[in-house]
């Protein structure tokens, strides 16, 4: 649970964990408030929220390398469908806010002219009014999966509450799953997989981007999910610039390029 790039620190108790960060402009406490307001089996139970963080139930962490990623992906979607996506969107979206946010990131980090042109072309190709709008978790990656002791129920930790720039649109969550399918956890943390013993029904336990595509309602939502995946990866660059080796930053730029190949 001490993974991540936010700078948060953790204090462990017998049945709970305290998460705190004094340098994130209140992001951690807002996360705790969101969890408390949206309590369900899909997310951690929050016991208290304070100025710089919150205290939540203690959960079991199973190493990424031992997870059957196909089974976990299906479990993430099931929990989101039942407890998160089934709720109404709460944050009004501003396309201009999204455009401005992406422009700021492109101004700070050089990802190449081809990626910038792809972003513009893909944004224009999407029918944004046709996309499913609902409450979103904001960060349902494989890395944010834990399990409830005693029941082994899948729990998705560390939500990122929606904003006008990163809104309550289901494609935002699908884009995060695609980020994992591209290998985010392997690139960021150097994780490897031991999937041979975990293979089921003769198929690999590892996921690829097209497993995520099966959860999109149509090509339009898939296009939006790929776009949001690229935006999510761009959003990691400021954090990685502070706490990750240059190779990790270069590899994430490579992931951005890979993601742009999923659409014609």
Give the ranges of each region predicted by the language model.
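All-alpha amphipathic helical-bundle segments outside canonical DNA-binding/catalytic cores
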Residues: 219-229
């Amino acid at each position: 649970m001490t993974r991540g790039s936010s700078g948060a620190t953790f204090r462990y108790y017998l049945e709970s964990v305290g998460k705190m960060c004094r340098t994130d402009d209140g992001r951690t406490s807002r996360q705790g408030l969101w969890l408390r307001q949206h309590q369900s089996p899909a997310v951690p139970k929050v016991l208290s929220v304070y100025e710089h963080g919150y205290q939540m139930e203690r959960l079991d962490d199973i190493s990424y390398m031992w997870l059957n990623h196909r089974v976990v992906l299906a479990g993430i979607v099931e929990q989101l469908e039942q407890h998160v996506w089934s709720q109404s969107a709460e944050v009004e979206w501003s396309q201009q806010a999204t455009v401005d946010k992406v422009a700021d990131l492109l101004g700070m980090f050089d990802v190449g002219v081809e990626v910038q042109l792809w972003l513009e072309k893909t944004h224009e190709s999407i029918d944004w009014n046709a996309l499913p709008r609902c409450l979103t978790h904001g960060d349902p990656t494989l890395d944010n999966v834990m399990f409830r002791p005693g029941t082994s129920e899948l729990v998705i930790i560390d939500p990122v509450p929606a904003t006008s720039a990163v809104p309550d649109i289901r494609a935002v969550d699908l884009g995060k799953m695609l980020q994992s399918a591209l290998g985010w956890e392997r690139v960021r943390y150097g994780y490897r997989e031991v999937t041979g013993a975990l293979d089921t029904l003769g198929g690999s336990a590892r996921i690829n981007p097209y497993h995520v595509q099966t959860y999109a309602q149509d090509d339009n939502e898939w296009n939006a999910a790929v776009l949001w995946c690229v935006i999510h990866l761009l959003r990691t660059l400021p954090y990685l610039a502070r706490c990750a080796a240059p190779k990790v930053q270069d590899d994430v730029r490579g992931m951005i390029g890979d993601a742009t190949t999923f659409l014609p």
